[in-house]
Structure formats: structure tokens, C-alpha cells
């Protein structure tokens, strides 16, 4: 029985590349926003066991439904890659629209916490698992015009460090 890897933001960039690489050895549960991009990715993956849904990861109800569907499809989850995210608005900190800032936090941090909450109970029950939270070099460099994005990714970095301490006793790993 193959291990199961969940990848959010699977239709572009890092998520897409991971799906292509991991599909050779793992069963996959993928989510992204674009039906067209997901269909193209599924064509590239060929004959492997993939469950997929397209939705906005910031939608609490859809995210929860995805978690329930994945657990029903596979019965377990071994690795979760929190990859969904974007720099949706480049602006000076003094000029950033607070609605844009809130959305970046929802997309880059809060939704990842929601995904952790969906799959943690499965990992805890079997005393095994790994959460991989994809961050950004912005956590190192904090460049101008990336205040909202950098802050949201920095928040996720902090959450990851705390999460590691909280789930370590359950034999669950966390890395960035």
C-alpha cells in the first residue's frame, strides 16, 4: 500500500513539480484553484491514484469537505504539503489595502492551519506523519513592496516552529 501525500496549491510551480515527482511512488490528494490547470496536470501524471478537487483554499467549508473526501478516499494521510499561497498585492506597508493584507494572511497562513487541523487527527491516531509548510525566501530578505506577503509567510514560519513542538510527542514531523 502506497503512502498518501496531500499537496495544496498543486496546479502551479512548486506544488505541480512535487506532484509530478511524487506520483511515481505515492498516492496523491491534490487541490488547486484552476480546473484547466488541474486537468493538464492529471494528464501529465498518467496512471496513478490521484484524488483531486479545485476550490479556493481560503473557503473553510470547501477546505473541510476536501479533508473529509481525502480521508474517505484513502483512509489515511502520511504527508501534507501546505503549498498554496501567493503574493496577491505588492505594495508599500504604508499603502497596503488592509483587505488585501487580510486575504494574504488567510491564503498564506490561516488556510494552512486549517489543512493541518483537517489531517492532524489521522496522523495522531497512527502516531506518524509529516507536515511540510512551503515558505519563501521573503522570510530571509524582507524586501520592499512585500510587507503583506512577508508578514504572512513569517507568521507561517512561527506557526510551524510551534506546531513542531506541539506534535512531536505524537511522532509527527514539521518542516519548512
Model-derived features: where do they sit?
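The beta1-alpha1 cofactor-binding region of Rossmann-like NAD(H)/NADP(H)-dependent oxidoreductases
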Residues: 54-65, 98
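Substrate-binding pocket helix/loop in short-chain dehydrogenase/reductase
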Residues: 91-93, 100-102
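Active-site helix of classical SDR
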Residues: 116, 152
Amino acid at each position: 500500500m502506497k503512502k498518501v501525500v496531500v499537496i495544496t496549491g498543486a496546479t502551479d510551480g512548486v506544488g505541480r513539480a512535487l506532484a509530478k515527482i511524487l506520483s511515481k511512488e505515492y498516492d496523491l490528494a491534490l487541490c488547486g484553484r484552476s480546473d484547466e490547470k488541474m486537468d493538464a496536470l492529471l494528464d501529465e501524471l498518467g496512471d496513478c491514484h490521484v484524488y483531486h478537487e479545485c476550490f479556493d483554499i481560503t473557503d473553510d467549508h470547501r477546505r473541510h469537505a476536501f479533508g473529509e473526501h481525502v480521508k474517505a478516499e484513502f483512509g489515511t494521510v502520511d504527508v501534507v504539503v501546505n503549498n498554496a499561497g501567493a503574493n496577491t498585492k505588492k505594495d508599500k506597508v504604508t499603502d497596503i489595502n488592509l483587505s488585501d493584507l487580510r486575504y494574504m494572511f488567510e491564503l498564506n497562513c490561516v488556510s494552512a492551519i486549517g489543512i493541518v487541523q483537517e489531517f492532524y487527527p489521522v496522523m495522531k491516531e497512527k502516531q506518524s506523519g509529516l507536515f511540510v509548510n512551503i515558505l519563501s525566501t521573503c522570510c530571509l530578505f524582507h524586501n520592499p513592496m512585500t510587507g503583506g506577503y512577508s508578514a504572512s509567510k513569517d507568521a507561517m514560519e512561527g506557526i510551524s516552529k510551534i506546531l513542531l513542538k506541539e506534535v512531536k510527542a505524537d511522532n509527527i514531523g514539521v518542516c519548512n
